[in-house]
From Swiss-Prot:
The lineage of its organism: Bacteria, Bacillati, Bacillota, Bacilli, Bacillales. The keyword DNA repair applies. Its cofactor is Mg(2+); Mn(2+). Keywords: DNA damage, DNA repair, DNA replication, Ligase, Magnesium, Manganese, Metal-binding, NAD, Zinc. SUPFAM superfamilies: BRCT domain, DNA ligase/mRNA capping enzyme, catalytic domain, Nucleic acid-binding proteins, RuvA domain 2-like. Residues 586-667 form the BRCT domain. Zn(2+) binds at residues 401, 404, 419, 424. It holds the Pfam family DNA_ligase_ZBD. GO terms for cellular component: cytosol. The gene is ligA. This is DNA ligase. One of its GO terms (molecular function) is DNA binding. Belongs to the NAD-dependent DNA ligase family. LigA subfamily. Gene3D superfamilies: 5' to 3' exonuclease, C-terminal subdomain (1.10.150.20), 6.20.10.30, BRCT domain (3.40.50.10190), DNA ligase/mRNA capping enzyme (3.30.470.30), Helix hairpin bin (1.10.287.610), Nucleic acid-binding proteins (2.40.50.140). The keyword Ligase applies.
Length: 667
C-alpha cells in the first residue's frame, strides 16, 4: 500500500503540473492523451481505494453529481461594484478627487475581464466555498462548478484562511469550440463568451461545467491581515506565490497621464488577447490610502472602472412601441431591424422620452445609429437624415394611456408623460413584478411571464393575492409542473418572513428606494407605527428628504393601501423590522457610541472579525481618521492613519490592549 500511496502522490503532482502548464501558462509539455491516461489511472485507484480520494484531488476537476438547486449564501463582506468612467474628463475628475483627499498617489491599472465575478473561500489552505456576486450581499453557492476550473487551486501553497475574489471567464478558443458543438447539435448559440461563462457556471451538473473549459483571474483579497502586502501590486504578487492566477498585463503608474497611456495601449491591443475585456480598472495602489478613502454605499472611493467606448452600428427603425412602468411613466421603445451590437442581437432599444425623439429628429423608417450604453442597454443615438426615405413618419406620443385609455399628463418639471390611473393594468402588472424582485420580497420562480399569466387569469389583482395562491391555481399555468409549483409555493411561504424593509420597498412607494426603506424600517420597527407617522416627523430623519416624506405619508394614508396591508396581515406576512437596531445595541461603555478606526496588521484576529465584534458592542467602525474619531487600534506596520491620529491627539490602543479589553468583558 505504501507503493500505491506514493503513486497517488506522484499522480497528483504530475496532473497538477500539466494542468497548470495547459490552462494557466498555455504551454503544455505533454499531449492531451498523456494527461488523460494519468487522470484515468488516478480515477481508477480512487474508485478501488476510496481512502485515497482527497478534497484536493485532480479528479475533482471532472465534476460530481448533479445538484437540485443552488443554495443562496450571504457574503461575509459585500461584493461591491465599481463606479464608471467613460472618457478622459471622468478620469481626471476621479484623479483630482483622489489627490485632494490623500495627496500624491500611485495607481494600479488592470484589465477589466468580461466575465462573472466570483468569491472563493479557503480554510487552512483548502478551497471550501465559491459564490457568485449575486446582488452584492447574497450570492449562489457554485462551489462544485468552480472546482472544475483548473486555474483555481484546490489547495493553496500555504495553509491560510482567506477569501479571494476574481473574474471567471471563457477564453475565446473555448467559446468558439462550444458554439461549433452547439451548431452541430442544432442548439441555440451563445451570444458572447460572457454569456457562455455565466451559463456554464449555473449548470446544476458540474460535469457539464467541466467540459466548458472556463478560467479565472484573481484580482483582490477580502482581508489583507495574513498578507505581507502594503499595496495592491504586492498583494497580487503574493497571490501568484500562493498558486492563484492573476492577470500579468497590469501596470503601476505614477499619475493620471500614465493611466491614460495604459488605456490607449489596451484599447488598440484588446483584440490580440485570448479573452474578452470590456475596460480598465484603476485602483489607488497603496492599501493604507485605500483604507483612508473608504467606501460609499455602492463602491470603493479609491477605484474606478473605465469602460471602452460602446460599439455603434447602423440599422433601420421599423416602429415605436410604448411601455408603461409601475409608476405610470410611458416610455417609447424603438423596434429595430435585428442587428449585432457588442456580441448580442438587438431588435429593441430605448428612446427614453418624446423630447429625445424630437430633439434627435428620429422618424419611423429612418436609418439609425444604435449602441449599448455601458455595453449593456441598447439605445438609439441618432438618426441619419441623409439616408431618410420619403415615407419616413414623424412620431407623436399619444394623449391617452395605451393600456387603460386614461389621459396622460406631464407633471411640472418632468419630461416623461405619465398615466395617473391607479387601476391601470400595465402599472399593476409592473408593480407585481417589482414586489417579487430580488431586493424586495425576493420570491424565486415568480417571473414576469408567470405574473402576467396570473394577472390575465384574474388569480392575482394586487400583491397580497400572491400569498393566497394555491396548488390548484398554479398547476394549470403554462410550463408549471408539480415540482415547480412546490418550489414556488415554498418560496412564497418563505417570503412571509422577510423583514419590514423588504415589504416597504416591494410596495413600490414612489421615491422610496432600498436605503430609505431600511432607514424607515429600523426607526419605526412596525408597519403600524409607520401608519401614524406625519410628514413633519419624516423630514427630520437623516436620508429622508421632502419628496420621500410626502410620498410615504400620501401612500400610507390611502384607504385602499390600508386595506391591502390588512390583507397581507391576514396571511401572516411579517410587518416587523428583523434587523439589528444600531441605536439600541447595548454594548460596554468602553466601546458603545464610540467611533473607532482599525489600522495595520492584526495577528490575533482578522480585521473583519474585529470590526464585527466592535459593532456588536455598539461602536461605529470607520475607515478614515478624523477629529471625530475616538480611538485608533493600531496593529503591526500601522501607517498614515496612526500618524494622523497622533497629530490629532486621538487615543491609540495596541492590538494587545484591545484584546485585553475584550478579555475583561468576557471574564
Amino acid at each position: 500500500m505504501a507503493d500505491l500511496s506514493s503513486r497517488v502522490n506522484e499522480l497528483h503532482d504530475l496532473l497538477n503540473q500539466y494542468s497548470y502548464e495547459y490552462y494557466v501558462e498555455d504551454n503544455p509539455s505533454v499531449p492531451d492523451s498523456e494527461y488523460d491516461k494519468l487522470l484515468h489511472e488516478l480515477i481508477k485507484i480512487e474508485e478501488e481505494h476510496p481512502e485515497y480520494k482527497t478534497v484536493d484531488s485532480p479528479t475533482v476537476r471532472v465534476g460530481g453529481e448533479a445538484q437540485a438547486s443552488f443554495k443562496k449564501v450571504n457574503h461575509d463582506t459585500p461584493m461591491l461594484s465599481l463606479g464608471n468612467a467613460f472618457n478622459e474628463d471622468d478620469l481626471r475628475k476621479f484623479d483630482q478627487r483622489i489627490r485632494e483627499q490623500i495627496g500624491n498617489v500611485e495607481y494600479m491599472c488592470e484589465l477589466k475581464i468580461d466575465g462573472l465575478a466570483v468569491s472563493l473561500k479557503y480554510v487552512d489552505g483548502y478551497f471550501v466555498q465559491g459564490l457568485t456576486r449575486g446582488d452584492g450581499t447574497t450570492g449562489e453557492d457554485i462551489t462544485e462548478n468552480l472546482k472544475t476550473i483548473h486555474a483555481i487551486p484546490l489547495k493553496m501553497k500555504e495553509p491560510l484562511n482567506v477569501e479571494v475574489r476574481g473574474e471567471a471567464y471563457m477564453p475565446r478558443r473555448s467559446f468558439l469550440r462550444l458554439n461549433e458543438e452547439k451548431e452541430k447539435n442544432d442548439e441555440q448559440l451563445f451570444a458572447n463568451p460572457r454569456n457562455a461563462a455565466a451559463g456554464s457556471l449555473r449548470q446544476l451538473d458540474s460535469k457539464l461545467t467541466a467540459k466548458r473549459k472556463l478560467s479565472v483571474f484573481i484580482y483582490s483579497v477580502n482581508d489583507f491581515t495574513d498578507f505581507n502586502a502594503r499595496s495592491q501590486s504586492e498583494a497580487l504578487d503574493e497571490l501568484d506565490k500562493l498558486g492563484f492566477t492573476t492577470n500579468k498585463n497590469r501596470a503601476r503608474v505614477n499619475n493620471i497621464d500614465g493611466v491614460l497611456e495604459y488605456i490607449e495601449k489596451w484599447t488598440s491591443q484588446r483584440e490580440s488577447l485570448p479573452y474578452d475585456i470590456d475596460g480598465i480598472v484603476i485602483k489607488v495602489n497603496d492599501l493604507d490610502q485605500q483604507d483612508e478613502m473608504g467606501f460609499t454605499q455602492k463602491s470603493p472611493r479609491w477605484a474606478i472602472a473605465y469602460k471602452f467606448p460602446a460599439e455603434e452600428v447602423v440599422t433601420k427603425l421599423l416602429d415605436i412601441e410604448l411601455s408603461i412602468g409601475r409608476t405610470g411613466v410611458v416610455t417609447p421603445t424603438a423596434i429595430l431591424e435585428p442587428v449585432k451590437v457588442a456580441g448580442t442581437t438587438v431588435s429593441r432599444a430605448s428612446l427614453h422620452n418624446e423630447d429625445l425623439i424630437h430633439d434627435r429628429d428620429i422618424r419611423i423608417g429612418d436609418s439609425v445609429v444604435v449602441k449599448k450604453a455601458g455595453d449593456i442597454i441598447p439605445e438609439v443615438v441618432r438618426s441619419i437624415p441623409e439616408r431618410r426615405p420619403e415615407d419616413a413618419v414623424t412620431y407623436h406620443m399619444p394623449t391617452h394611456c395605451p393600456s387603460c385609455g386614461h389621459e396622460l399628463v406631464r407633471i411640472e418639471g418632468e419630461v416623461a408623460l405619465r398615466c395617473i390611473n391607479p387601476k391601470c393594468q400595465a402599472q399593476l402588472v409592473e408593480g407585481l413584478i417589482h414586489f417579487v424582485s430580488r431586493q424586495a420580497m425576493n420570491i424565486d420562480g415568480l417571473g414576469t411571464k408567470i405574473i402576467q399569466q396570473l394577472y390575465q387569469s384574474e388569480l392575482i389583482k394586487d400583491v397580497a393575492d400572491i400569498f393566497y395562491l394555491t396548488e390548484e391555481d398554479l398547476l394549470p399555468l403554462d410550463r408549471m409542473g408539480q415540482k415547480k409549483v412546490d418550489n414556488l409555493l415554498a418560496a412564497i411561504q418563505q417570503a412571509k418572513d422577510n423583514s419590514l424593509e423588504n415589504l416597504l420597498f416591494g410596495l413600490g412607494i414612489r421615491h422610496l428606494g432600498v436605503k430609505a426603506s431600511q432607514v424607515l424600517a429600523e426607526k419605526y420597527e412596525t408597519i403600524d407605527r409607520l401608519l401614524t407617522v406625519t410628514e413633519a416627523e419624516l423630514v427630520e430623519i437623516h436620508d429622508i428628504g421632502d419628496k420621500v416624506a410626502q410620498s410615504v405619508v400620501t401612500y400610507l394614508e390611502n384607504e385602499d393601501i390600508r386595506a391591502l396591508i390588512q390583507k397581507l396581515k391576514d396571511k401572516h406576512v411579517n410587518m416587523i423590522y428583523k434587523g439589528i437596531k444600531t441605536s439600541d445595541i447595548e454594548g460596554h461603555p468602553e466601546f458603545s457610541g464610540k467611533t473607532i478606526v482599525l489600522t495595520g496588521k492584526l495577528h490575533q484576529m482578522t480585521r473583519n472579525e474585529a470590526s464585527k465584534w466592535l459593532a456588536s458592542q455598539g461602536a461605529k467602525v470607520t475607515s478614515s481618521v478624523t477629529k471625530n474619531t475616538d480611538v485608533v487600534i493600531a496593529g503591526e506596520d500601522a501607517g498614515s492613519k496612526l500618524t494622523k491620529a497622533q497629530s490629532l491627539g486621538i487615543e491609540i490602543w495596541t492590538e494587545q490592549q484591545f484584546v485585553d479589553k475584550q478579555n475583561e468583558l468576557n471574564s
